[in-house]
UniProtKB/Swiss-Prot annotation:
Residues at which Fe cation 1 binds: 10, 13, 29-30
Catalytic activity reported: reduced [rubredoxin] + superoxide + 2 H(+) = oxidized [rubredoxin] + H2O2
Family recorded in the similarity comment: Belongs to the desulfoferrodoxin family.
The species this protein was found in: Nitratidesulfovibrio vulgaris (strain DSM 19637 / Miyazaki F) (Desulfovibrio vulgaris)
CDD domains given in the database record: DSRD (cd00974), SORL_Dfx_classI (cd03171)
InterPro entries: Desulfoferrodoxin_Fe-bd_dom, Desulfoferrodoxin_Fe-bd_dom_sf, Desulfoferrodoxin_N, Desulfoferrodoxin_N_sf, Desulfoferrodoxin_rbo, Desulfoferrodoxin_SOR
Protein name, as recorded: Desulfoferrodoxin
GO MF annotations in UniProt: iron ion binding; superoxide reductase activity
Note, other: Catalysis occurs at center II. Fe(2+) ion of center II is the electron donor and is converted to the Fe(3+) form during the reaction.
Purpose: Catalyzes the one-electron reduction of superoxide anion radical to hydrogen peroxide at a nonheme ferrous iron center. Plays a fundamental role in case of oxidative stress via its superoxide detoxification activity.
Length: 124
């Protein structure tokens, strides 16, 4: 049974879903159960994939990696998500964008996740 804010991917078509409301049953796509995307389990370099969270005057800035991640047509960060006090905030990126996002919110507990089209799901 999926849990709130877990991310799953279809191994056939590549659809990615995030659980917004946890219910019973399994997530299925293309006739098969979707694969749970555990963070940080690919062979990608950690220094280019683990999100770095910075507190700013207006909220939080999330940069992908301590070394800037490539943002090329064949290799880029698709999205950055900030989870703040149990709420989810997402910015979608495209090739050519900077691998970072700003979130103008105030919170006491934050974590960040991102998805690389080649190296998967990562969390800080």
């Amino acid at each position: 049974m999926p849990n709130m804010l877990e991310v799953y991917k279809c191994v056939h078509c590549g659809n990615i879903v995030e659980v917004m409301h946890a219910g019973g049953g399994d997530l299925v796509c293309c006739g098969e159960p979707m694969k749970f995307m555990k963070e940080g389990t690919s062979d990608g370099a950690k220094e280019k994939h683990v999100p770095v969270i910075e507190k700013t005057a207006t909220g939080y800035k999330v940069k992908v990696g301590s070394v800037a991640h490539p943002m090329e047509e064949t290799h880029w960060i698709e999205w950055i998500e900030l989870i703040a006090d149990g709420r989810s905030y997402t910015r979608f990126l495209k090739p050519g964008d900077a691998p970072e996002a700003e979130f103008c919110i105030q919170a006491t507990e934050v974590s960040a996740r991102e998805y690389c089209n080649l190296h998967g799901h990562w969390k800080a």
